[in-house]
């Protein structure tokens, strides 16, 4: 599948959404995830808590803040910087939300996970046109004030004393307005009911706009210590009633951003043995090769969001491998799941909505693009 380096673009693309029609940045999606209703002129932005060290951006996630810590800091920022126009909302861990009423979305922003170890001042948000200059100035002011406030916060002083990275600045990016997304149940008649299982706000927001129910799994963290077994069981249970179940695991992406090869390998093994294997065994307890749930045949697809090579520590815009196991599919010659082997797969390179239409058993239009 042809992917985009932007997570929010690709995650919608695999569900069949045309990025040119529905793209509004990840901010509005994360707003939907945490239940923030946006007015038409509300600019919603992902708001990372990051660690700056001198002139460099040291860590886009502050060494993985606990959500409780992030909540303390976001409430503190809302108390001191919030206004009728500006509102800070708590998300998950280091991933939070900034909403600017009447904000202009035409900004040039760099995701902080793209610039670890780089001079942060070179990547500060800028206006893409004259109309957005007021919004850009406001964001720069909020960032400057956040550095002043967070540096002296007791929580950060405690983190420094314990040898942890302080969350000493906000970093807004991924801004946009409320998107117009048609529910999947209207696009695909086969889907009467669907669900999504994830710990990540972005995916939860996409799920809400796509008309999917959100399944919460205790112990799902969005990191390598997530509850793989719990996600597997939740998927097995959901397949008794739902026509589509979207299970997302963030662990390998985070390991890639950390540049940690052993950890990334471990997350892949855990995905295989602790998530995929239990699901397949539950759907085919006799080992017949025929997957079933609630007396109906089941198709399973496995694919990553996008590459996050450990040596680059950021996303790349490269085709990603995928595998589909479904009734009636003739196996091809590919025996391993990796980028090189997948190039020889029977499906070739799929683009746009061709993946979801292939998976759903629908012939993609000849002109489908993405």
How should each PLM-predicted stretch be described?
Residues 1-6, 10:
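Single conserved hydrophobic/aromatic residue that forms the stacking wall/gate
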Residues 26-152:
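A contiguous, mid-domain pocket- or channel-lining segment that forms the substrate-recognition surface
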Residues 52-57, 100-123, 210, 236-280:
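Active-site His/acidic residue clusters
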Residues 84-91, 152-167, 217, 244-246, ...:
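Flexible, glycine/charged-enriched surface loops at secondary-structure junctions
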Residues 106-199, 203, 208:
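Long, charged alpha-helical interface segments
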Residues 172, 177-267:
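Anion-binding catalytic surfaces of enzymes that hydrolyze or transfer phosphate/sulfate esters
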Residues 267-318:
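Metal-dependent active-site segment of extracytoplasmic phospho-/sulfohydrolases and closely related
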Residues 299-363:
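Internal helix-turn-beta structural module
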